[in-house]
Regions:
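ATP/NTP-dependent adenylation/nucleotidyl-transfer catalytic domains that generate, transfer
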Residues: 18, 23, 161-163, 219-220, ...
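Enzyme catalytic cores with a strong preference for nitrogen-chemistry domains
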Residues: 1-350, 366-375, 407
Length: 638
């Protein structure tokens, strides 16, 4: 469980209606199976000790006595199981019958959570048998122990403070104000739901959405264990659709109509960090809850969950296309507002034939369509110099032509050579000065020509470059409005590809596809045999790794060793551990060292959950030390 990952399980035993001894054997069999997978939190269905469909047999004393005896047996038989276990049963108390979840840990019964909302509509008539536990807060004597009985219990792990668990039962989730809301506000990072939800057409997707939505709304893990085969089919069928969700993401789902166990690793540290980040999330002491301690051994959890290698890019094409369309619209609407505000009808962009300037031009073209402005008011400036290749030059020319934009070529070789002479720089020394002189010359030309034309200079730099500081200060770092500032490099490719696929123009599509096939490069060093010699990813590392690091550092707040661990799992077979660690160190070093560039960024629209604007998402001092983070990385062993 180190780094916050906790192995959880939801299982459906094969019940025999009203046969508590048979059900006890089935429940213990499921628990033992969960134990082999090292689950530390185990959840079984509602009323699983008796079966949910006992109907009026719940009024029989013999059944209730047998259920209680079975609970004691299950507790005794699981004394050696290192887990917090939830099982469901009917329980008498103070002249009423309650539908409860019993929490077990190392042979001890820790507490009883009664069902709050008792359905009595359509196929449900639970009020015939059960009372609501909404206003019940008392203790029950079990042997020589006093055990709490209430709907507001939170079970807290003594060895891992973020592992806090609350319980609700079936219908409790389906009401306007579920008990889980109060439990989450009280500090529960995981909600378990013991359910017996019958099947009917359309209910599967609704149930899934309900669990996902509640986990997102409460910023929690949600474990849903429901009844399955073995329940009476007199009038209903139960499908066993067990679900495990974390903050809006489905981690595991059982195939229906099979009694199975599902597993997942919920990251309770991330949930705690996310709640702390949200200033509107109530503090834990705002809710009236009772804390019940439990113990499990805090050990390393073997990870089976998958982490998206491209967290900024949806893996499903339909969703990805929708995302691309949305992002292009956000970028265009941001630029439209700025141009409208300053009464500007012209835009200028430095066009290199690379990905970023291509995307910026596509956004400008869409903006002009929205504003009803002529495409010739788009001024594209291409500025070849020492590193420019024929491929990128030709693509820049073709792209501007396809979009109907005006293209001007300004060869900057002579100007840069004059500048070298002015500052006494040897043009055979290809150092940072050699490169930055070109970048700043281009920016000066663009700024001045924008003034000449009365145009808005649109910046092209993307989120990944800003994170790494891969931009020349007051060179390509500067513009009048940066449309790509919150678009990571891995997403830039998909945006350009989406535009190519949907533009409906063959020539434009071919140009965009060739740009996509061109190596990423600033083209500041002379080419070799007419081909790009300076490749960005050879110098600063693969953007797919850096975008992965960026997402989990800023969006998830993960520590360096945690990012390293999940990166090794995610990119296994693509990069070895040494390579992953090498570029992770470079990422942290550059991210801290280059903050001064981000502290004075031009305006630009936020499009995703990760952004670096000093006016919005990242308030970070330019002179902060990376020592604490680098120290953690130095301790890692490859």
């Amino acid at each position: 469980m180190n780094q916050g990952f906790i192995k959880v399980a939801a299982g459906t035993p094969q019940v025999t209606v009203a046969d508590c001894k048979a059900n006890t054997r089935a429940i213990l069999e499921v628990i033992r199976e969960m134990e082999t997978q090292h689950a530390k939190l185990m959840v079984l269905p509602e009323l699983c000790i008796t079966g949910y469909t006992c109907q009026d047999l719940f009024l029989q004393r013999r059944l209730l006595d047998s259920a209680w005896e079975s609970l004691l047996t299950i507790a005794e038989e699981t004394a050696d199981v290192d887990a917090l276990i939830f099982v469901g049963l009917p329980m008498r108390m103070n002249g009423k019958l309650y539908n409860v979840a019993a929490a077990l840990n190392h042979g001890n019964i820790l507490g009883f959570v009664p069902k709050t909302h008792i359905p009595n509509y359509n196929e449900f008539y639970e009020q015939r048998h059960f009372a609501s536990g909404a206003d019940v807060w008392t203790d029950v004597t079990v042997g020589e122990e006093s055990v709490p009985f209430a709907s507001n219990l939170i079970f807290s792990c003594e060895g891992l403070p973020e592992l806090t668990v609350g319980a609700e039962i079936c219908e409790d989730l389906w009401v306007p104000l579920p008990p889980s809301v109060n439990l989450a506000q009280g500090g529960a990072h995981i909600i378990v739901n013991l359910s017996a939800s019958d099947e009917m057409v359309g209910k599967e997707s609704y149930r899934r959405d309900l669990v996902k939505g509640q986990s997102a709304r409460l910023v929690c893990g949600y474990i849903y264990a429901t009844a399955g085969e073995g329940e009476s089919s007199q009038d209903l069928v139960f499908g066993g659709q067990n679900l495990i969700a974390e903050n809006g993401t489905m981690l595991a789902e059982a195939k229906r109509f099979q009694n199975t166990v599902i597993y997942g690793e919920i990251d309770v540290q991330r949930l705690a960090d996310e709640r702390r980040r949200l200033s509107t999330y109530p503090a834990s002491d705002d809710a009236d809850c009772q804390i019940v301690p439990f113990e499990v051994e805090v050990e390393e959890t073997s990870l089976t969950r998958k982490f998206a290698p491209y967290p900024f890019v949806p893996s499903v094409k339909e969703e990805r296309d929708m995302r691309c369309e949305e992002i292009l619209n956000i970028q265009a609407m941001g630029l439209k507002k700025r141009m409208s505000h300053i009464h500007c009808q012209k835009a200028m962009v430095g066009l290199s034939g690379g990905l970023d300037s291509t995307l910026a031009l596509l956004v400008i073209a869409r903006t002009f369509q929205l504003m009803g402005l002529p495409s010739e008011n788009i001024r594209c400036i291409t500025m070849p110099c020492f590193g420019t290749t024929d491929r990128t030059y030709q693509n820049a020319c073709k792209l501007s032509q396809c979009l109907g934009a005006a293209l001007t070529e300004v060869n900057i070789k002579e100007a840069v050579n004059i500048h070298f002479r002015d500052i006494g720089h040897d043009d055979s020394v290809h150092d940072v000065t050699y490169e930055n002189c070109q970048a700043r010359e281009r920016t000066q030309i663009l700024m001045d020509m924008a003034n000449q034309e009365g145009a808005l200079l649109v910046g092209t730099g993307d989120l990944s470059e800003l994170a790494l500081g891969w931009a020349t200060y007051n060179g390509d770092h500067m513009s009048m409005y940066g449309v790509n500032a919150s678009v990571p490099k891995t997403l830039v490719r998909h945006l350009v590809r989406y535009y190519a696929d949907t533009c409906g123009e063959k020539e434009l599509e071919e140009v965009l596809l060739d740009i996509l096939d061109t190596p990423v490069s600033p083209e500041l060093l002379p080419p070799k045999d007419g081909k790009i010699a300076q490749k960005t990813e050879d110098l600063v590392g693969p953007y797919e790794l850096h975008d992965f690091y960026l997402y989990y550092m800023l969006r998830a707040g993960f520590e360096p060793d945690k990012i390293y661990r999940i990166a090794c799992r995610t990119f296994e077979g693509t990069y070895d551990k040494a390579t992953i660690l090498k570029w992770l160190k470079i990422f942290y070093r550059r991210f801290f060292a280059q903050q001064f560039k981000r502290s004075c960024l031009p305006d630009g629209p936020k499009v995703g959950s990760v952004a670096l604007s000093p006016r919005g998402d990242l308030r970070m001092p330019s002179d902060a030390s990376a020592a604490v983070w680098m120290e953690a990385l130095e301790k890692l062993e490859v």
